[in-house]
């Protein structure tokens, strides 16, 4: 009888832990909610759509251009343009699949400011540690200046 009570108590404890854990699970829209009409990866529309379905966060990728400007894009080379060796103007002239131009980080954050979803900012791995450090300094300053520190989380796969 004691064994049954112990097993029952253990099972109930595990079930309660599972319920509590499920309540803490959050959804992050990877590159925004982009697999929808009128959206594209890392687009401002994808950010807005992630917010509209109440995602905990919307992940997006940031690069530093050759002229030291911050842009939002996943790939190091997109539509033939290499992010790190091209200017902001060259990068932002790229048209995304939904018709938007590739956004600057400033444009992306300007839109995010009026939304509720958290910002999951991925700094892409750059060619040198110096470039990454410069990108980090600019990103942190921009986030702070816009008052978005409490809504922003950072990730990177930098070496």
Show the residue positions of the predicted features:
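Sec-dependent N-terminal signal peptides
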Residues: 5-15
């Amino acid at each position: 009888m004691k064994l049954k009570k112990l097993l029952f108590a253990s099972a109930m404890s595990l079930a309660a832990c599972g319920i509590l854990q499920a309540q803490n699970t959050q959804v992050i829209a990877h590159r925004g909610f982009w697999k929808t009409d009128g959206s594209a990866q890392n687009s401002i529309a994808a950010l807005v759509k992630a917010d509209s379905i109440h995602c905990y966060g919307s992940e997006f990728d940031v690069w530093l251009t050759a002229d030291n400007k911050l842009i939002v894009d996943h790939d190091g080379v997109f539509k033939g343009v290499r992010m790190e060796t091209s200017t902001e103007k060259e990068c932002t002239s790229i048209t995304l699949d939904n018709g938007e131009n590739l956004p600057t980080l400033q444009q992306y954050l300007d839109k995010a400011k009026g939304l509720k979803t958290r910002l999951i900012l991925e700094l892409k791995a750059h060619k040198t540690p110096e470039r990454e450090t410069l990108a980090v300094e600019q990103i942190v300053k921009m986030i702070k200046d816009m008052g978005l520190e409490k809504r922003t989380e950072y990730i990177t796969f930098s070496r």
